[in-house]
């Protein structure tokens, strides 16, 4: 591999924002925040869903609020009163 063209592959803490679960893995993700864990400072990547909160792994149903997304879609791509798209 050519030196200087590849991103740093380092240990990063990923934090599930829905339940606070944290895990350390290696990644090239660029982050703005750091966190101290087990006496060592790591870059922090915040994620919405992990294996600790995803319904496939937990077996529990979770309702997601998509009303805002649906309204945004209808406003952007909805049909006008005359039947033609915007």
Swiss-Prot record:
Q: Which GO terms describe its molecular function?
A: structural constituent of ribosome
Q: Which UniProt keywords apply?
A: Ribonucleoprotein, Ribosomal protein
Name this protein carries in UniProt: Large ribosomal subunit protein bL31B
| Segments forming a coiled coil | none
Oligomeric state and interaction partners are given as:
Part of the 50S ribosomal subunit.
InterPro entries in the record: Ribosomal_bL28/bL31-like_sf, Ribosomal_bL31, Ribosomal_bL31_B, Ribosomal_bL31_sf
**Membership in a protein family:** Belongs to the bacterial ribosomal protein bL31 family. Type B subfamily.
Query: Record keywords: Ribosomal protein included?
Result: yes
**Gene3D superfamilies with a match to the protein in the record:** Ribosomal protein L31
**GO annotation terms (biological process):** translation
Origin organism of this chain?
Burkholderia cenocepacia (strain ATCC BAA-245 / DSM 16553 / LMG 16656 / NCTC 13227 / J2315 / CF5610)
Q: Which domain of life is it from?
A: Bacteria
Q: Which GO terms describe its cellular component?
A: ribonucleoprotein complex; ribosome
